[in-house]
Amino acid sequence: MNYIHQAQYYETDQMGIIHHSNYIRWMEEARIAYMDELGFPYKKVEEAGIISPVLSVQCDYKAMTYFGDRVCIDVKLSSFRGVKYEISYEMRDEKTGELRASATSAHCYLGKNGRPSNIKKELPELYAKMMEELQKVEKEQ
């Protein structure tokens, strides 16, 4: 799935480039849009009593992004093991295709009690969709 973010003036730093912390925010925006597109908005999942915290984030910065640039973020499910999953992101200039950053974020599914949630049992439709997405990505490789 592709998500477009237009770099905002308030996201720039003293050097006139997008501050590195904003790429992490863009990843979250793109991840939320990705889950919406799959038919499982975060709100719907949380209403079912399941939360999905971030376990880790890793981002490699390749080229600078400036105010007004439009960045296309390609979002893919890169692994899914029932409770834990990882999402990969490629952030490219929308016009030139230049790679600006590549990143991953790791997450898990927990019940509101903070314990791992068996979504295969508790949200079987989400589990099936995640498995379908993973198979789609594996076929592309």
Residue ranges and their predicted role:
Residues 1-72, 80-141:
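Terminal targeting signals and extreme-terminal segments of soluble enzymes
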